[in-house]
Amino acid sequence: MAITAQDINKLRQLTGAGMMDCKKALTEAQGDIDKAIELLRKKGQKIAAARAGRDTTEGFALADVNASADHGAIIALGCETDFVAKNDLFQQIAQQILSLALAQQPATIEDLKQLEIDGLTVQERITELVGKMGENITLSAYETLSAEVVVPYIHTGNKLAVLVALQGAKGEDVVVAGKDVAMQIAALNPIAIDKDGVFTSVIEQELAIAREQAIREGKPEAMLENIAQGRLNKFFKENTLANQPFVKDNTLTVAQYLTKIAAGLVVKNFKRVLVGA
């Protein structure tokens, strides 16, 4: 059976595969479109197996919320090169995965991989994409938050995405404030909302470092604990969101800024995803 340019174009539109791959698959399938699609899918699986384990330090991060803005999700689709990260099909699949995550609200990244997009699971769709792009592709991150108000932020270039969950008030001004706080999280990468959220092991490590530094500086032994505690407090101010100076007005902390927007407004939680991290 002769393979026509029309057949090749139809297969390309259905699969996104390259022209020569489509021609080869159609020839092997003797012009049967369905068999050709299956052959291309199997080729993708072979490429995926060969590429598995390669570092996916590039990629595309997305964040969004549902219609009521009380649930949000972040996904990151990882790949090997920035060239693939900028590919329209790659970004389209990432958007489909995010939309699916928001609609179905799976509990874990593994649950998300098993949900279906147009008859294929997310993982199968990614494997198919590997065959088309020719490099390792992974669903490298999936995070969700639910609260009274959830606000997304995507940094320019789609390498960094943030969700911030707010409680205590609603309204357009709260959403604007949430965007400001999300941008602060993107820029300064706090490790917790406040000191109560910092792991004990981190606190102990910071105290030990502060004591050692004070000893090297020749401080009296009787002053070591006070000095260490003072430096720990500085660490909290620099690394916990509520205590950080607000980037748009450093006369206020983030907590004070939110209180100024609405009494009782606080950050309930936040998520930050950096491609390749």
Swiss-Prot record:
Entries under InterPro entries matching the protein: EF-Ts_dimer_sf, Transl_elong_EFTs/EF1B, Transl_elong_EFTs/EF1B_dimer, Transl_elong_Ts_CS, UBA-like_sf
Principal cellular location given in the protein's record: cytoplasm
Subcellular location as annotated: Cytoplasm
Gene Ontology CC terms: cytoplasm
Highest taxon, organism lineage: Bacteria
MF annotations from Gene Ontology: translation elongation factor activity
The entry's keywords: Cytoplasm, Elongation factor, Protein biosynthesis
Stretch list, region Involved in Mg(2+) ion dislocation from EF-Tu: 81-84
HAMAP family reported for this sequence: EF_Ts
Recorded family membership: Belongs to the EF-Ts family.
Entry function: Associates with the EF-Tu.GDP complex and induces the exchange of GDP to GTP. It remains bound to the aminoacyl-tRNA.EF-Tu.GTP complex up to the GTP hydrolysis stage on the ribosome.
Protein name, as recorded: Elongation factor Ts
Organism: Amoebophilus asiaticus (strain 5a2)
